[in-house]
Amino acid sequence: MKAMKQRIAKFSPVASFRNLCIAGSVTAATSLPAFAGVIDTSAVESAITDGQGDMKAIGGYIVGALVILAVAGLIYSMLRKA
């Protein structure tokens, strides 16, 4: 409790307001749409579009492997009980 009172006593509203102003101005400056126009994302978008087919195939293989493991687990548990 004493440590809490000491921290409250050290609290400086001026420094907190300054930090809040700095954080607000940095947020406002970096969230402007002007920065979004400078960065060219067409290469990234085309790479994502090209990779969609591969991702679907890989996802199919993963689902198939999980189904095989689930069936093997069921068969193993049934054989253990028998």
Curated annotation (Swiss-Prot):
The keyword Transmembrane applies. One of its GO terms (cellular component) is membrane. Coiled coil: none annotated. InterPro entries: G8P (IPR008020). The keyword Endoplasmic reticulum does not apply. It is found in: Virion; Host membrane. Its main location: virion. SUPFAM superfamilies: Inovirus (filamentous phage) major coat protein. Residues 79-82 are cytoplasmic. Residues 29-57 are periplasmic. Keywords: Capsid protein, Helical capsid protein, Host membrane, Membrane, Signal, Transmembrane, Transmembrane helix, Virion. Residues 1-28 form the signal peptide. It is a single-pass type I membrane protein. Self assembles to form a helical capsid wrapping up the viral genomic DNA. The capsid displays a filamentous structure with a length of 760-1950 nm and a width of 6-8 nm. The virion assembly and budding take place at the host inner membrane. Belongs to the inovirus capsid protein family. Homomultimerizes. There are several thousands of this protein in the phage capsid. This is Capsid protein G8P.
